[in-house]
């Protein structure tokens, strides 16, 4: 493998701030590409990253040269094989993934629905593992390595409940990160409603997503305390189409889901 010294292309006399801004721009483009597994056009990328097209062209050219992006048919761009290689190297070294994958297999097999494991990263959840039973699981936008706003997912609320322990903490969070994205008409965007949901999690030990992230899909999620008794490491969920498992039905599965988690991983729930 050929390694390129990043200092070799430094322009003499170029201010440090400009170089940093350029690096930030390239990283922003790379992250945006991750939102489009099937590729994305230049116009959409320019809107997402909010940079001039000339700057976007330079960033994409740098990513393509390094193998982190590919220029596909009809002018679209997507993540390249070098990014995939690095992502899988990171993915494989996650011990927690190896711990939770048997649980996801068991949950998907028992309920016949899609199971996820995710961790909190700032105001977002990052999906680190996913299991969809053949011919049965719900088709969703979630992908391993993908992200969603934490406040509108069961996984996110299961984790936020312990990061934001009271109404004041929730209000401060909404002030910093707001206005919170309203994915559907059910999304809890106001501090009071979100705080009530997080209090529910602490009282019941699980979170519900009532079509808050994707219309027609609901979810139940449990925080997992794998590394610390008070701070969840991540969360596991079951997601289903509303017409197949309504919110009441999915909540009825909470006891069995908790038992299955504890039988597989031990006493890691609340």
Describe the predicted segments one by one.
Residues 125-131, 137-141:
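Amphipathic coiled-coil signal-relay and dimerization helices
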Residues 184-262:
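Extended hydrophobic
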Residues 104-112, 116:
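Short regulatory alpha-helical segment in sensory/regulatory domains of signaling proteins that mediates
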Residues 116-118, 126-129, 220-222:
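Conserved hydrophobic/aromatic positions in well-ordered beta-strands
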Residues 1-97, 262-267:
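N-terminal helix-turn-helix
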Residues 177-179, 261-270:
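Cysteine/selenocysteine-centered motifs that mediate thiol-based redox chemistry or coordinate metal-sulfur cofactors
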Residues 9, 137-215:
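Short, solvent-exposed recognition segments
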């Amino acid at each position: 493998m050929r390694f390129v010294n990043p200092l070799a292309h430094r322009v003499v006399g170029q201010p440090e701030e400009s170089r940093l801004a350029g690096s930030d721009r390239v990283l922003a483009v790379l992250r945006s590409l991750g939102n489009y597994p099937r590729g994305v056009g230049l116009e959409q990328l320019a809107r997402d990253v909010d940079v001039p097209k000339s700057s976007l062209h330079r960033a994409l050219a740098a990513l393509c040269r390094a193998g982190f992006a590919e220029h596909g048919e009809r002018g679209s761009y997507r993540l390249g094989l070098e990014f995939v290689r690095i992502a899988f190297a990171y993915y494989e070294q996650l011990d927690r993934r190896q711990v939770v994958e048997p649980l996801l297999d068991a949950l998907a097999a028992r309920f016949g629905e899609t199971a996820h494991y995710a961790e909190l990263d700032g105001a977002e959840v990052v999906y680190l593992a996913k299991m969809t039973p053949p011919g049965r699981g719900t088709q969703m936008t979630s992908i391993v390595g993908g992200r969603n706003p934490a406040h509108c997912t069961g996984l996110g609320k299961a984790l936020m409940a312990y990061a934001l322990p009271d109404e004041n903490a929730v209000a401060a969070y909404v002030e910093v990160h707001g206005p919170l994205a309203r994915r559907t008409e059910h999304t809890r965007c106001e501090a009071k409603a979100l705080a009530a949901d997080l209090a529910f999690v602490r009282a019941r030990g699980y979170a519900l997503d009532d079509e808050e992230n994707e219309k027609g899909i609901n979810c139940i999620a449990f925080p997992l305390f794998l590394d610390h008794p008070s701070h969840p490491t991540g969360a596991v969920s079951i997601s289903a189409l509303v017409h197949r498992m309504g919110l009441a039905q999915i909540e009825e599965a909470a006891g069995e889901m908790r038992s299955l988690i504890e039988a597989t991983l031990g006493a890691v729930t609340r």
